[in-house]
Swiss-Prot record:
GO molecular function: glutamate-1-semialdehyde 2,1-aminomutase activity; pyridoxal phosphate binding; transaminase activity
UniProt xrefs under SUPFAM superfamilies: PLP-dependent transferases (SSF53383)
Species this chain originates from: Brevibacillus brevis (strain 47 / JCM 6285 / NBRC 100599)
Gene name as annotated: hemL2
GO terms for biological process, alphabetical: protoporphyrinogen IX biosynthetic process
Subunit-level organization: Homodimer.
This protein's name: Glutamate-1-semialdehyde 2,1-aminomutase 2
Lineage: Bacteria, Bacillati, Bacillota, Bacilli, Bacillales
Pathway(s) the chain acts in: Porphyrin-containing compound metabolism; protoporphyrin-IX biosynthesis; 5-aminolevulinate from L-glutamyl-tRNA(Glu): step 2/2
Cofactor(s) listed: pyridoxal 5'-phosphate
Domain of life: Bacteria
Modified residues annotated as N6-(pyridoxal phosphate)lysine in this record: K267
Amino acid sequence: MNREKSTQLFAEAQHYIPGGVNSPVRAFKSVGGNPVYIEKGEGSRIFDVDGNSYIDYIGSWGPLILGHAHPRVLAAITEVAALGTSFGAPTERETEMAKLVCEIVPSVEVVRMVNSGTEATMSALRLARGYTRRNKIMKFEGCYHGHADSLLIKAGSGVATLGLPDSPGVPEGTAHNTITVPYNDLESVKLAFEAFGDDLAAVIVEPIGGNMGVVPPQPGFLEGLREITEKHGTLLIFDEVMTGFRVALGGAQELYGITPDLTTMGKVIGGGLPVGAYGGKREIMQQVAPAGPIYQAGTLSGNPLAMAAGLTTLQELSKPGAYERLEKMSARLAEGLADNAKKLGIPHTLNRVGSMVCLFFTETPVINYETAKTSDLERFSAYFSYLLEEGVMIPPSQFEGMFVSLAHTDEDIERTIEASYQAMKKAFK
C-alpha cells in the first residue's frame, strides 16, 4: 500500500506536536513504521489520506460501537449544532442523558458529566477521599485509569508496595498514597488491606482489564473485592470507561452482577465526542458541589453536542438485538483468529469478553499484566504490519484489544479472518 502522504504529514506534525501525535499510542512506536493519517470513516471502515481503505477494529479506541459516521448520531449533532455549541448553562438534554444513564447502569443513582475518562476517574477518587476522609487508594498493575498523577503508578517488588512514579513529573508524595497490587490476585489484596486498610479510601479497578490487552476477571475476583471493601468501609470504584455500554448495556457490572459504590464512564457514552461521567450511590454523589463540599467543575461539561451524540448512541444500543448481534460477530471473529493460529502452530492465547477481543502471541494463559508481558512483541509488530497491508486496522499495540462494532458485517469478519491467516503466516515464517 502506498502511504506517502501519511508519511509526509507525520514528518510535518513532529515539528509542531510532541512526537507528532496528541496521544502516544497513535505514533505506532510499539509496532514500528509511521502512523496512518485518516481522512474519513464510514460504517466499519476508515479511509486514509492516500486513498487506502481499512476494516477498522480501533473504533476511535472504543467509542464508536455503532460504527463511523452513524446517520442518527450525525443528524443529532447537526440539529443541535445549529442552535449553538455550548452555553455554560443547563440544558434539557443533560437531564435526559443523566436519567438514561441512571436507568441503564445498576450502580448509578446520580451521575455527573465531565469531558473525559481521566476527568471521571480523577473526580471519583477525590470524591472517595472526601467521603471516607481517608488518603490512600488501591489500583491494579496493568489497569490504566487515565493520566492523573495518582494513577500513573507502577508496582514494586513484594506483595503490595507503596507506589513509585511511573512517569517523570509525578511527585513521590502523590505516589506514596497509591497502593499497587497484581490484577486477579485476591491474596495480595487481602495483605494490602491488612497493612493499609484503615487508610484506604477506594479500590479502583477495570472490571475487565482493557489496557493490558483484554483480561477478564477470574471467578470470584470481583466478588472478593466487593466483600473486602465493604468489610473495611472502603469504596469500590469500577472504571467502566472502556467496558461501559460495551460488554453489556449496563456494562461489566451488569454482566457479572457486582455493584460497585462508584462507576466511571467514557468512550461509548459520548458516541465519538469527548464525554466522561462518574456516578453511584446518591448519598455519596450528594457530596459533590454544589450539593456538597467536594469540588469539581468543567467549562464544557454536559455540552449540547456531546449530550446529543451520547444520548442517541445509548438509545440505539437500547434497541432489541444490539448486543446479541455484537456477541455473534465477536464470537465468530475470536473463533476464526484462534483457528488460524492453531492451523499454523502459533503459540497463542485468545481472550474475549463481548465485543472486546485480544489475540496474544503466547501460550501462557493471560490473567494479569505479568502474563500479558510474556507475549512475543516482535511477532506482534510484524503481524500488525502485514495485517495493515491486507486492509485491516487493529490497535498498534499488543496491549490493546480489538473493538467490534454494530457496523461490522459478516463479510467484514470473514475477510478479517482470511487476512489474519495471511498476516500470521508471514509474521511467523
